[in-house]
UniProtKB/Swiss-Prot annotation:
Pfam family, one: GIY-YIG
Lineage, uppermost ranks: Eukaryota, Metazoa, Ecdysozoa, Arthropoda, Hexapoda
UniProt protein name: Structure-specific endonuclease subunit SLX1 homolog
GO molecular function, one term: 5'-flap endonuclease activity
Gene that produces this protein: slx1
Start-end of SLX1-type zinc fingers: 196-249
Subunit structure: Forms a heterodimer with mus312/SLX4.
Amino acid sequence: MNSYDPQDTGSQQEETVALKGHFYGVYLLCSQSLDPRYRGKCYVGFTVNPKRRIRQHNLGCDFGGARKTSRKGPWLMVMIVHGFPNNTVALQFEWAWQQPSLSTRLKMYPELKRKLPRETFFDYNFRILSHMLGVGPWNRLPLTVRWLETDYERPFSKTLPNHMEIVSGKVSISASQRRRPDDAVPPPPVAWASECHLCMQQIEQPEKSRLGCTNQMCRLTCHMVCLANYLLGDETGHYIPVGGECPLCETRLSWAALLQRKRLLMGVPEELQDHDEDLSDDIDVDSDIEDGAQELSN
């Protein structure tokens, strides 16, 4: 799934719409400053809204940008990794990308501790990312690596897990999936069974514990735990599956797609619809990559 050729225009996507409140991204900035002290320096950060975040960085810390990027741009957001299940996991990924020599998962790789001679800051950060995507727990996450600037696109030196995607194109955040044209036909209601197809027990609190197949013609109804255990099969040491086949219709399932469908069926919480600006990007945004951070702040 993740085979990707930067010259292949078929892999280009102009825009992907993500639902507000369900997008968590970790991005890489590259400075385009004319000042040689800053040009080419990089910055890793977390965001729930990429368009707004790059605007804040380029306006400066007085407008919500990070202190360490203020007056050292303009900045380009060249790539973003998204598909994290929540902001906690995304922030942990951000911190490890920023601090590979301190991360429990990465510090055993001495080659990641410092930038190599003649290696650009972008190449160094890209090398760290390549390692991260092949290391647990991140190698089991249904992540998408999205190139935002074509001039920086390049193939990964290491093969990524098959369930990860590498794409190109901008991201926009939709305020609500319920915003449809007045004449749009609403989707048909989902026909749920009252019992789990796997354990045959009644599903209590279905809004929290029920999952179904992504195939709209399939009537699979399961406890979340039951379906997770089924998809894991004989795989030991894990609690969350990557994917597998539907036990009813044999459709190939992605665990991330199952959870996304569940969120869409539940709708967007009112607090997320009304307070987009409260979805702060500012947690840990003032920390930098360890190597080069001192140079960037001078």
